[in-house]
Structures are given as C-alpha cells and as structure tokens.
C-alpha cells in the first residue's frame, strides 16, 4: 500500500529554548527565513506524502497560521510588487493537505502518535520528528518508504553517532544486515553512557504499520514518566519484525541550542546571497 499520510509531532514544550519558546512554538523558530517545521513538511512533500497531520498543544496556534492562507498579507505584497515574497508566502500555504490534532497532556512521543490514530486509520504511515533537518538527494523519509515497499515491515531510520553521544538517543541492537537494512535484536531508549549496544541511533524518521496503535494503547508509562514510542516499537518487533535502515543524508540537529546555531551558520554559508558576507564576518571575529 502506498504511503500517503505523515504525522509530525509538535506538542513539546521546547524547554531547551526558553524563554524564547514561552510564547512561540519551538517549531516556528527560523533557520534563515523558514521555520524549522517547514523544512520537515517539505521533506514529507518531496517524498510524495499528500496528507500531513501535525500534533500540537497549547500555545501552538502559530503553526496552523503559518500553513494557512494569509490573504491580507498576499494583497499587500502584490500591491507593493514584492513578487518573490508573495510566492514564498503562497508556497508555504499550499504545500500539502494539512490537518491538526491537539495532544491535551504531555505524555510523551508515543502518546502524541497515538493521538493521531483516527486520522491514520488502517494505513501505513510516516513519522517525521522536528529536531532533525535532513538534506539528501533522496528525502530521508522517502528512503524509508522505499524500504517499506520492499519488505512490508515497519522501518526505523538510523544513523551512526559518536559513542559519547549514544545516551542522547534511542539505540538499536542490530542483528543481520543487508545494504544498510538491519534486523533488530532490541531497541534501547537513551542508554546510560557506556552501555549502548551499538552506535546506530534512531533519528526521528519512521515508517510504521498501523498495528503500532494497538501497542501504544497498551503501552505502560516508561522512561521520564512518558509513553515511549521506542518501547511500543520494541513490543511490535517481538511479534512482527521491525527493521532499522541506515539512511543517507546530512543531518542538522535543531533540537538544542548549539546545534541550532551551527545549523543556522551552515545554511547561511550555503546561501548564495549570504555566503560571502557571512564568511567574511566569521574570518573577522577569528582574528
């Protein structure tokens, strides 16, 4: 079955970016001239996703407004002859069929995914988390979709990380592999330093069969007092093989401040308009 739907969880409090996120959704913080969540939506659209449901929470209305039509703004831009800006505004309003559901309680990623179950129905679906922007010739989520079409099994996107970073991620304990596709012995959510079974970290891209909702509904509270998606995937894997796929692409961590700043600089250095001036500025402060 073709994958046409995607879930983007965006209900988190964004505490790492306080006080900036006290009144503004973390997902609306910009990398250059686009909010981070737009990069995620664009990846889904480039992969052929048609319907996107964003799981939001309190004080997240700005996300809905961003992907909605802004007729008054469009009229002003048209009257002033600012055609480039007009096109960019219209573009963000027409990326995909956008839907929204609110996660009323902060019960974790697994609960956020479960909240969107009525939208998904009995179809396989994609999940894209907003903490990582991935640039690749083939969109990261599309790579996973291709693997799903081949195997018919749930696929978890992974990439290698340094051993000292494994405690920050869900980690897979891989078994057999074929062309970067791994069967998995177990999934470990944020292992203690020095205890990780590998350096293959789960990187916020998933293609899941709808069976996962049954496991999420029964899932007990896990690490951090939350319903963990990784725990539900572990139970699914015990009854129906779940694969990990080491996808290609350059990953940018925008889920914490240092990574966010690095990403902004890296994107600026790739921008034709900004590259020269930013390069000269960096040289000037390093003298």
Swiss-Prot record:
Catalysed reactions, as listed in the record: alpha-D-glucose 1-phosphate + UTP + H(+) = UDP-alpha-D-glucose + diphosphate
Family to which the UniProt record says this protein belongs: Belongs to the UDPGP type 2 family.
Lineage of source species: Bacteria, Bacillati, Bacillota, Bacilli, Bacillales
Annotated InterPro entries: GalU_uridylyltTrfase_bac/arc, NTP_transferase_dom, Nucleotide-diphossugar_trans
Pathway: Glycolipid metabolism; diglucosyl-diacylglycerol biosynthesis
Organism: Staphylococcus saprophyticus subsp. saprophyticus (strain ATCC 15305 / DSM 20229 / NCIMB 8711 / NCTC 7292 / S-41)
Keywords: Carbohydrate metabolism, Nucleotidyltransferase, Transferase
Gene3D superfamilies referenced in this protein's UniProt entry, alphabetically: Spore Coat Polysaccharide Biosynthesis Protein SpsA, Chain A
UniProt-recorded Gene Ontology molecular function terms: UTP:glucose-1-phosphate uridylyltransferase activity
Annotated PANTHER family: UTP--GLUCOSE-1-PHOSPHATE URIDYLYLTRANSFERASE (PTHR43197:SF1)
Annotated protein name in UniProt: UTP--glucose-1-phosphate uridylyltransferase 1
Function of the protein: Catalyzes the formation of UDP-glucose from glucose-1-phosphate and UTP. This is an intermediate step in the biosynthesis of diglucosyl-diacylglycerol (Glc2-DAG), i.e. a glycolipid found in the membrane, which is also used as a membrane anchor for lipoteichoic acid (LTA).
Gene Ontology biological process: enterobacterial common antigen biosynthetic process; UDP-alpha-D-glucose metabolic process
UniProt key word Nucleotidyltransferase: yes
EC number, UniProt record: 2.7.7.9
């Amino acid at each position: 079955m073709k994958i046409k739907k995607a879930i983007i969880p965006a209900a988190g409090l964004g505490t790492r970016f306080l006080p900036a996120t006290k009144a503004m959704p973390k997902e609306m913080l910009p990398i250059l001239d686009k909010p981070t969540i737009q990069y995620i939506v664009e990846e889904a659209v480039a992969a052929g996703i048609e319907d996107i449901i964003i799981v939001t929470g309190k004080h997240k209305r700005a996300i809905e407004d961003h992907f909605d039509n802004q007729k008054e703004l469009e009229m002003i831009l048209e009257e002033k002859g600012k055609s480039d800006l007009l096109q960019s505004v219209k573009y963000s309003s027409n990326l995909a069929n956008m839907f929204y559901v609110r996660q009323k309680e902060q019960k974790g990623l697994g609960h956020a995914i479960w909240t969107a179950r009525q939208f998904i129905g009995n179809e396989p679906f994609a999940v894209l988390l907003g903490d990582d922007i991935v640039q690749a010739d083939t969109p990261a989520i599309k790579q996973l979709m291709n693997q799903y079409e081949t195997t018919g099994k749930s696929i978890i996107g992974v990439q290698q990380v340094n051993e000292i970073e494994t405690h920050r991620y869900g980690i897979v304990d891989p078994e057999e592999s074929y062309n970067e596709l791994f069967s998995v012995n177990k999934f470990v959510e944020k292992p203690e330093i020095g205890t990780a079974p590998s350096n293959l970290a789960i990187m916020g891209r998933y293609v899941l069969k709808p069976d996962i909702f049954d496991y999420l509904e029964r899932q007990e509270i896990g690490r951090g007092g939350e319903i963990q998606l990784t725990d539900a995937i572990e139970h699914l894997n015990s009854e129906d093989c779940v694969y990990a796929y080491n996808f290609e692409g350059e990953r940018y961590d925008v889920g914490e401040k240092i990574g966010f700043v690095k990403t902004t600089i890296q994107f600026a250095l790739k921008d034709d308009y900004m590259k020269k001036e930013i390069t000269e500025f960096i040289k000037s402060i390093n003298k």
